[in-house]
Structures are given as C-alpha cells and as structure tokens.
C-alpha cells in the first residue's frame, strides 16, 4: 500500500513551554484551524482536547504528553497537504521527564512563551533539553493581549537568557487590550484576523504608518540572517540589498534546520490571532523526518550504526511512552524511524531480548483513536498488545537488529511510604503501582525491608501527589500516605571488652554459655567501596569455647546488630573478637552461646559509646547568580557543608553535603527562593554521626 502523504510533507513537532504560557490553548487552536475539532476546548473550562486525564482537567495543567495527528495546507491553501504529528508536553518541573521523552522523538519544536512573563525557569529547562537533542525550533510569543505584553522584550530575553540567535519574522500591531494583529515581515503586509469566525479568515492590509520604520529595520535584520545561509544568497544580497520571498524562506529554513537561528512569531491563541501563521511556519521552516540526520543506533555487537528515514530500510522504532487505556489496556506510543509495521506483525525488542506481536495500531487524537492498518517511517502511533515493553525500548526487525540509544532518566529525589486503607486494597495497590511505574521511568516503587512498608519515590511532591491520585481514580485504590522517612543507623565509637554469661539451671538439663568479646569500630570497606557492616574474629585458644559453638556466638551478635541498642535502628561498622569464655559438658548448647553473644553486644555497645548515624546526600544546586547568597544560606540552615562552587551556562553550581532529613520539602523551597529558576539533584554519599541534640530527639520519639 503506497504512502498517503509523502515523507517530505510530514512534520513531527512538539509544543513545549513553561507552565501557563498557553501551550495547550495553542494546540487546541491548531486542532480547530486544521479542522479536527469543531468546538474549541478552553483550558479554564476543563474541556481542552489534549488534557485528557481527569487530574489535568481539574488542575488546569498538562501532565502527560498526548499525541495527535492533523493536516495543514496553509493559510492561503498555498501548500500541498502536510501531515503534522503534534505532541503536547507538560511544563511543570516535576514532569520534565515527559518533555525529555517527547523531544527525543520529535524532529522540530514550537516553544511557546508568555508575552508578559517572557523567559521563565521551566523555559530554560525545556531549552536545555531541546539543545541536548539538537531539535530545530521556532518560537511563538503568546498572550500578546495580556497586560505587560512586549514581543521585542521577550525576544531580547531569549537572546540573553537562552543564548539563542532569535530572528523575528513578524512584528505585533498594538499590545495588551490594543493587540490587533501582526505584520508579516516577509510580505510586508499587516494580517488582521476576523473575530466573527474565531479567526478562520483574515485580511491583508497595509502596515500602520507608525510601525513602517520599525518593520523595515527588522526586515533588514531578517534578510541578513537568511543571506548568511549560503554564499550565493550572500552574494545576491550584497549586490542588490534584497532577496525574493522564496529566497528568504529558503535561507531561513536552511539556518533553522542547522540550529543556527530561531524564528519568532507572535499572537494570542486565546483571542484567535496568530496561530495559523505559526502553522505556516511549521510547514515552511521545520524539518521533515528525512531532513534531519539519520538516527544513530548500535548493532547487537555494540558497533555504531544509523538508520535512514525510509520505508525501504528495515523496521526500527522507539517506544517513547506507555499509557494504560480503560478500554484497550496498554498503549505503547512509538516513533517509527525506518521501515513499515503492519498490525499483526511480530517485532523484536533487543533490550529485553524478546519477540512480541503487535495486535492493533491506532493513531491517537488526544484520547480518541482511529485504527490504522500500518505505520511507516516518520509516523507516530500507538500499538496495542505489547506486554513486555518499557519506555525507551527499541522495537525492530528480528532479521536486522539495532538498538536505538537508550533514554537517560533522572534518579528520584523524594520518597514517601504508602499503605492501603484496607486489606482489599493491598493486592490492587501493588498492581496499580506496577503499572504506573512501567508508564513512568522517573517513578520507583520498593518495599522497605526493615518496616515492610511500600515506599514510592519520584521527581517531586506534585509528582507523587498525582501518582496517589491516579491510584485512587484509575485503579480505585485508597491509600494512606506517610511523611517522608529517613533510614537511620547505629554504630559504636570506642573499644570495649565485655563478658556475658547465660546460665539457666532449673532441674533437668540447663543452659550454659559464657563468652568474653572485644568490640571496636570497624573501618573497612568491601570490594564496592561500601563500609562493611560487621566482622567477626575468632581468637579462642585451648578450646575454652568449643569449635561447634563459635558460629553460634557470631550469629547471636549479628542478630542483635539488626535491632540496634539505642533506638532500634540496625548497627553498622562493628568488629567483634571472641577471645575467651567457658562451657559446661552437659548444659552448654548452640542456643546458650547464641544468647550469650547477643547479651555481650547489648551490654558492650552501651559502654562503647554507641551513636546514631544519618544518610548524607551529595547535593548539586544550579542557580542564577542573583539567588546564590539565598540558596547557600538556606543550605547552611539545613546543616549543609558547602564543598565547592562551579560555573555553567545556566549559572552557578553549588556542591554540598546535606543530611537527607533536612532535604524534605527542598524542591518547593528552592523553587520559591529562586523564583523557580534554580534546579537541584541529589544522591546518597555516606553515613555520618547525628549531632547529640538531634540524636536525643530521635531516640525519644522511637522509644516513646
């Protein structure tokens, strides 16, 4: 079956931005103008087509990126029909993972900025991610009808803060309440959209006299930018000082595709102005799948390879998102890089080493779906029937195996305990958490061996709130959520010799075990460089403790280590040497010596200056210079030790060691100190002694 749309006419794009820049509204307008949705869904009514999870409609934010396919032939029907696959991405920092995944499979992006707020913290994160994957992009400065909106100021911020070479291709006519339309700097005409039909039609009129000079200045800058694309264009420009419309398009396109410039458009999606011009920009300036470099991959032997975007190449696709659908079960969203996949075909997953059959293939329009027979290079679609696929896996032809690069996912930074409210919820909870963890690699689930509790970890407090919320709504599981917990430990600080005697004689056979044990701090590490928990040494001479009982003494000490001596936390870093003792021919037994060993530790550890240890985290905070003092002051208040400072393009990097107990609520706190512009990551570094005043509180609360 031949292609319906030639590959050159495909555009796989993402719409990304900071929370509240208006990106979902922009996507809604795109669907309206391209004829897919007949009534525009407003976000503040909770009716937007792309926000299909209940939590999204309630909170008015986008959590998971929905994928949609639509067609566009231009504002003036000047193009052949182009197929645009759109992925709407979340802008909240707790969901950065969704943005990262989307950018990984896109060929181009439209980054939306708010006309009054300009470049906000999450826009810096999104921009960094787009740079990481080399995604060509155009900019839409939205909300030009908002008070304080200023198109040129936002363009200047993008230049200075994001270090991007911005080239405006439009200029706004009026702003705030007086925002009327835009000047097209290529055609040098003003575009006025018709308000009666929600901006479906427009008029081209002359540029207002007061804006003529500024429009001409910006046009010259734009033509210079286009001319730098090639020597021929530059020669022509230097000879005549002008380029034709086609040459301008050609030059701008070449430079956008090379990530040398970023074109800026403006408008107000909510007021139905400017979105169709952005769609024209997507078709004109963003790449088709076969106009980006061939996807890099590896063969099964780890040799570097690549796959061209072609139907004739062997099949290769990346599973970039999993979702559970109430009607069809598991949906696996894939981006096809090469070859053809028909429903019913078998695919090979080299990451898992498994072969699976694709049941059906559907094209998603937000959460509505159309069944299709096949997908080809460049397509984005969802497969039904794959059981063993996780995010980031490759699907390919078993005869021609390649592994597309793995996606890197960040380590979770916050954990809480969850427990089902009733016995009936217990089994449902583990199924629900398993499914949610398969969908979202930045969310982890584990069982705490000490407490037996289920611990969930994620990218932030909002992230975990939404997980608990989804358990309740989608899986009907009610759960209690605990406060974040810290895994403390205990140890000893000095050397001590301890005698312990366990004697029971009450008629018949008694019990007799008698030992002398030396306890001291153990400063040894294992082959992984981790501190050793326990070491037992046998120095018994002359059989005063018979060989068959020595293992029991060690066992008794080790079991008591798990229960601690101060607050019931496991002990680590203890060396025990058995050097003397005595036995009874009839009454001694393994049990008696085991109990004697455990008594020796219990008594000895108290004399050996036992103390409580806490996990210390290695914390890295990236912050703009303006907030450096506040961020460092806050880390000091959290008992942090600043180890050093670095610089990177996003600002200053602070490296510190901070107790985990002081890091709860930090994500929210650092966000408010830096107005959301600082970001942080942390990982476990070591255990260290807790200050006495805090240790006393811990012991008191554990023993009460």
Swiss-Prot record:
InterPro entries: EFG_II, EFG_III, EFG_III/V, EFG_IV, EFG_V, EFG_V-like, EFTu-like_2, G_TR_CS. One of its GO terms (molecular function) is guanosine tetraphosphate binding. GTP binds at residues 17-24, 88-92, 142-145. The keyword Iron does not apply. Its main location: cytoplasm. It comes from the Bacteria. Coiled coil: none annotated. It is found in: Cytoplasm. GO terms for biological process: ribosome disassembly. The keyword Protein biosynthesis applies. NCBIfam families: EF-G, PRK12740.1-5, small_GTP. Catalyzes the GTP-dependent ribosomal translocation step during translation elongation. During this step, the ribosome changes from the pre-translocational (PRE) to the post-translocational (POST) state as the newly formed A-site-bound peptidyl-tRNA and P-site-bound deacylated tRNA move to the P and E sites, respectively. Catalyzes the coordinated movement of the two tRNA molecules, the mRNA and conformational changes in the ribosome. Belongs to the TRAFAC class translation factor GTPase superfamily. Classic translation factor GTPase family. EF-G/EF-2 subfamily. This is Elongation factor G. It comes from Francisella tularensis subsp. holarctica (strain LVS).
């Amino acid at each position: 079956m031949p292609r319906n749309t030639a590959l050159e006419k495909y555009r796989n794009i993402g719409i990304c931005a900071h929370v509240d820049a208006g990106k979902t509204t922009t996507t809604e307008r795109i669907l309206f103008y391209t004829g897919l949705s007949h009534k525009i869904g407003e976000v503040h009514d909770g009716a937007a087509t792309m926000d299909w999870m209940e939590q999204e409609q309630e909170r008015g934010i986008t959590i998971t990126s929905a994928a949609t396919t639509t067609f566009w032939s231009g504002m003036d029907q000047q193009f052949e029909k182009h197929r645009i696959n759109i992925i709407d991405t979340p802008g909240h920092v707790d969901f950065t993972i969704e943005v990262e995944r989307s950018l990984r499979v896109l060929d181009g992006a439209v980054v939306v900025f708010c006309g009054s707020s300009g470049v906000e913290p999450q826009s810096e994160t999104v921009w960094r991610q787009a740079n990481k994957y080399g995604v060509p992009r155009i900019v839409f400065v939205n909300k030009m009808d908002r008070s304080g909106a200023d198109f040129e100021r936002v363009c200047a911020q993008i230049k200075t803060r994001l270090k991007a070479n911005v080239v405006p291709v439009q200029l706004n006519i009026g702003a705030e309440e007086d925002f009327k339309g835009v000047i097209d700097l290529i055609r040098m005409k003003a575009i006025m959209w018709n308000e009666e039909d929600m901006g479906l039609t427009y008029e081209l009129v002359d540029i207002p006299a007061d804006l003529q000079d500024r429009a001409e200045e910006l046009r010259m800058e734009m033509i210079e930018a286009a001319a730098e694309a090639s020597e021929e264009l530059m020669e022509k420009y230097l000879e005549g000082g002008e380029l034709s419309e086609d040459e301008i398009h050609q030059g701008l396109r070449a430079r956008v595709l090379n990530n040398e410039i970023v074109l800026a458009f403006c408008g107000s999606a909510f007021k139905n102005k400017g979105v169709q011009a952005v769609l024209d920009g997507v078709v004109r300036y963003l790449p088709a799948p076969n106009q980006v470099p061939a996807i890099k991959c590896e063969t099964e032997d780890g040799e570097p390879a690549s796959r061209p975007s072609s139907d004739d190449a062997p099949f290769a696709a990346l599973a970039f998102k999993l979702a559970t659908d109430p009607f069809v079960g598991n949906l696996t969203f894939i981006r096809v890089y090469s070859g053809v996949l028909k429903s019913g075909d078998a695919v090979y997953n080299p990451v898992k080493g498994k072969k699976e059959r694709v049941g059906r293939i559907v094209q998603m329009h937000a959460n509505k779906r159309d069944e299709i027979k096949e997908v080809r290079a460049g397509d984005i679609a969802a497969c039904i029937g794959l059981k063993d696929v996780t995010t980031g896996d490759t699907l390919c032809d078993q005869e021609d195996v390649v592994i597309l690069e793995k996606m890197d996912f960040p380590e979770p930074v916050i954990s809480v305990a969850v427990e089902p409210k009733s016995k009936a919820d217990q089994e449902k909870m583990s199924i629900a958490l398993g499914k949610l963890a398969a969908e979202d690699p930045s969310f982890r689930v584990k069982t705490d061996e000490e407490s037996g509790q289920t611990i969930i970890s994620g990218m932030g407090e909002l992230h975990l709130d939404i997980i608990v919320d989804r358990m309740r709504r989608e899986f009907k599981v009610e759960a209690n959520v605990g406060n974040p917990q810290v895994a403390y430990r205990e140890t000893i600080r000095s050397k001590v010799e301890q005698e312990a005697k366990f004697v029971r004689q009450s008629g018949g056979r008694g019990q007799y075990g008698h030992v002398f044990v030396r306890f001291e701090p153990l400063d040894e590490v294992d082959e992984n460089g981790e501190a050793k928990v326990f070491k037992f040494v046998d120095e018994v001479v002359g059989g005063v403790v018979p060989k068959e009982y020595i293992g029991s003494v060690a066992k008794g000490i080790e079991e008591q280590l798990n229960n601690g001596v101060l607050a019931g936390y496991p002990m680590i870093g203890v060396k025990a040497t058995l050097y003397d003792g005595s036995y009874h021919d009839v009454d001694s037994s393994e049990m008696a010596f085991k109990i004697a060993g455990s008594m020796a530790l219990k008594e000895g550890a108290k004399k050996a200056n036992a103390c409580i240890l806490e996990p210390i985290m290695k914390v890295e905070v990236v912050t703009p210079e303006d907030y450096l003092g506040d961020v460092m002051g806050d880390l000091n208040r959290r008992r942090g030790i600043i180890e050093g400072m670095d610089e990177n393009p996003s600002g200053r990097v602070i490296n510190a060691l901070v107790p985990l107990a002081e890091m709860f609520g930090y994500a929210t706190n650092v966000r408010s100190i830096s107005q959301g512009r600082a970001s942080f990551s942390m990982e476990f570094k070591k255990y260290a002694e807790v200050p006495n005043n805090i240790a006393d509180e811990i012991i008191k609360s554990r023993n009460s």
